[in-house]
């Protein structure tokens, strides 16, 4: 190399490209984690409400995994065709979150006596109820919040 020759070029493009790809991968992992972190709890909630919509209260009671104090009669008084929340003809899972200092996941669901789920402009939307269920991540049992 002579005095008048320029120094050899260093290729920093590959380092910048690698850094960019790693950063994008990290962002993708974080976004996917936030999207799917409560997926199992949402899935068991959907199974429960799918059974209620189909009118299969026995299957819904099994998905609920009740404690001995929550008898089938109590379940039907809440979720049966003439129960407080029934008949459930359509539903929409609104959100799922883990409350502070809790080992359960709170899943909030809008339920309606009408199918399909009424829009906000529909007059039947006033009869839509919102219920929060607690799902235990360990065994996917359901309960009402304390």
Pin down the residues of each PLM region.
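Alpha-helix initiation/capping motif
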Residues: 34-37, 68, 124
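Short alpha-helix boundary/capping motifs
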Residues: 12, 19, 76-80, 87-90
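Generic structural signal for short, solvent-exposed loop/turn connectors between secondary structure elements
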Residues: 39-42, 66-70, 137-140, 145-146
């Amino acid at each position: 190399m002579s005095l008048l020759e320029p120094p050899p070029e260093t290729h920093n493009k590959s380092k910048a490209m690698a850094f960019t790809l790693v950063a994008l991968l990290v962002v993708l992992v974080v976004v996917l984690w936030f999207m799917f972190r409560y997926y199992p709890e949402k899935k068991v909630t959907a199974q429960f409400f799918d059974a209620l919509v189909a009118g299969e209260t026995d299957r819904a009671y099994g998905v609920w995994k009740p404690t001995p104090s929550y008898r089938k009669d109590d379940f039907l008084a809440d979720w049966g065709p003439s129960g407080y929340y029934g008949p459930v003809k359509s539903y929409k899972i609104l959100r799922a979150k883990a409350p502070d200092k809790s080992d359960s996941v709170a899943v909030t669901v809008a339920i309606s006596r009408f199918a399909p789920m009424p829009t906000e402009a529909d007059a039947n939307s006033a009869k839509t109820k919102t219920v929060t269920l607690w799902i235990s991540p360990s065994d996917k049992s359901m309960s009402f919040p304390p």
